[in-house]
């Protein structure tokens, strides 16, 4: 089971040290030096165990012990040594001769441990914020690249359309030239069938007939006006019929009507070709 602690022996005093006990211990250490702690209680007559005497001297009575706040340099050393050695406070205190292991342990538990936890939390939050900013930046870059690629695609389509547009204009010019040729051929064909002298003679003949018809109509109207009252109404009725009757069509008018109907069909064909050219 091992050796029982010396503090559990009968007659060993526990609890706070008195000023008289401190004076006896300091006087003995100054005379004999620190060491051989097992003989200290017997040689001094103190009712304390050897471990209690050593800790009292090391943590409170030895000269050069520094009290008060820890400097930033001391804090850094404690943090570094605690990460390497763990909670071995006596070993850590050996690197800080002016600080006791008890003071180092208390300062670690009350200040440094909480400070490190807060620093780790802040560092974690900062890392998360950086990660979020990085992801948002990547998303922005991806969006810009997508927009650039779409813009490039549109530019390529426009470039292809500009290349294809001269072909469509060429086809439109070809259709217009073709329609112009058809119109010229149509005019030449009918001018061959109806010479200018024949058309002029037909027009003069129709015009003279129209004038003679008007003279005959005037004579008839005067005769009807000079008749008796019985025939007056009949004469008026005949005048109205003659006035509303459609005069006979001359040769030139018939030809113009035929040309108009034929030209209407040609114009429909031309409009259809123009629509096809616009679609191309």
From Swiss-Prot:
Keywords: DNA-binding, Nucleus, Repeat, S-nitrosylation, Transcription, Transcription regulation. Residues 118-127 have a biased composition (Basic and acidic residues). Pfam families: Myb_DNA-binding (PF00249). One of its GO terms (cellular component) is nucleus. Specifically expressed in guard cells. Present in seedlings, leaves, stems and flowers. The modification S-nitrosocysteine is found at residues 49, 53. Residues 128-149 have a biased composition (Polar residues). Residues 9-65, 66-116 form the HTH myb-type domain. This is Transcription factor MYB60. The gene is MYB60.
């Amino acid at each position: 089971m091992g050796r029982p602690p010396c503090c559990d022996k009968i007659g060993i005093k526990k609890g706070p040290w008195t000023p008289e006990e401190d004076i006896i211990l300091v006087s003995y250490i100054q005379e004999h030096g620190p060491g051989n702690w097992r003989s200290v209680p017997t040689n001094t007559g103190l009712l304390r165990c050897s471990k209690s005497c050593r800790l009292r001297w090391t943590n409170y009575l030895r000269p050069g012990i520094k009290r008060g706040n820890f400097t930033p340099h001391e804090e850094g050393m404690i943090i570094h040594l605690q990460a390497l050695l763990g909670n071995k406070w006596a070993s850590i205190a050996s690197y800080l001769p002016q600080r006791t292991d008890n003071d180092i342990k208390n300062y670690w538990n009350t200040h440094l441990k909480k400070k490190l936890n807060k620093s780790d939390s802040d560092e974690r939050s900062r890392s998360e914020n950086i990660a979020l900013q990085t992801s948002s930046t990547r998303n922005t870059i991806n969006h810009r690249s997508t927009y650039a690629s779409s813009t490039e695609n549109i530019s390529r389509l426009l470039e292809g359309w500009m290349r294809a547009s001269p072909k469509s204009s060429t086809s439109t010019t070809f259709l217009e030239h073709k329609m112009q040729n058809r119109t010229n051929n149509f005019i030449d064909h009918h001018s061959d069938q109806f010479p200018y002298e024949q058309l002029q003679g037909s027009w003069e003949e129709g015009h003279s007939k129209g004038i003679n018809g008007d003279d005959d109509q005037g004579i008839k109207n005067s005769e009807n006006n000079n008749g008796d009252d019985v025939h007056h109404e009949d004469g008026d009725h005949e005048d109205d019929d003659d006035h509303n009757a459609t005069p006979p069509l001359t040769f030139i008018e018939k030809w113009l009507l035929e040309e108009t109907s034929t030209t209407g069909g040609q114009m429909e064909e031309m409009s259809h070709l123009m629509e096809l050219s616009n679609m191309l």
